[in-house]
Amino acid sequence: SKGAYVTNNKQPITFKVVDEAGGSGVNLSTVKIKVDGTTYTTSSTGMVSKGITNGYQFVFTPQTALKDGNHTITINASDNDGNAATTVSSTFTIDTVPPTLTISSPAAGLITNKSALTVTGKTNDATSSPITLTMTLNGTSLGSVAVETDGSFSKAVTLAEGTNSIVVTAKDGAGQTTSITLSVKLDTTVPVLKGITLAPNPVSTSASVAITVEVS
C-alpha cells in the first residue's frame, strides 16, 4: 500500500493490470514496473504472473536487496489496441533496523531510599521516525511517553518498596521494537542496632578494647 513501512528488503510487490470488459485485453509485452529508476518487464527474473478476470495479477520480487529508506514504484501497461493506461505510482519505506534506545538515568541496579524516580534517555530511528515510546513499572503500563524532537525523553515514576522492574520500549513506524529492562530497589527500612560487644573485658585503663556493633 502507498506509504507503507516494510522490514523485508526483498519485499514482493503485487499489482494487477486489467482491461475493461469487452476490451481488447492487456498486452503483456507492455506491462512494466519501475523500481527506483530500474525498469522490469514480464520476462524479468523475479516476475510471476497469473490470469485473472479481464487481466493479470503480477508479483515481482526484487533479486537484489533494496536499501533502507524510501522507494518509488511506477507501473505502465497498454491494451492490445495500443491504448496506454494511466501510469500508476506508489511509495514504500524499507526499515530493517530497530530503533536505538539508551537510558541515561537511573543506573542499572540502583538502590535508593527515595520513592520518586525519573527515568531519562534517548531514542532514534533513522528510517521510520517518529518513535512510539512506552513504559511499564512492575508489569503495569504507564502509557505512552513523550519523545522530544531530539529523541530525548523523561518520565517520573513512583517506586514500591523492594525491587522494581522498569521496562522501556521504543517502537518505530515499521513496527520494530527495542526494549531495555531496569532493576531498581527501594529500601526505606531504618537500620536496627542489635547489640554492642566489647572484647576482651577491660581489666585496666591501659588495655586495648575492640568494639563490635551489629546492625541489621
Model-identified regions with their sequence ranges:
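Proline-centered linker/hinge motifs at extracellular inter-domain junctions
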Residues: 1, 26, 98-99, 106, ...
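Flexible, low-complexity linkers/stalks enriched in Thr/Pro that connect modular domains
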Residues: 89-102, 182-191
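Aromatic/hydrophobic beta-strand junction motif of beta-rich domains
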Residues: 13-19, 119-123, 211-215
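Short strand-edge motifs at loop-to-beta-strand transitions and within beta-strands
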Residues: 54-60, 151-155
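Short, solvent-exposed loop/linker segments at the N-terminal edge
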Residues: 3-9, 108-115, 201-207
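Extracellular acidic loop/turn motifs
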Residues: 19-28, 124-133, 216
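Surface-exposed, short loops/turns at beta-strand junctions within beta-sandwich domains
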Residues: 62-70, 156-163
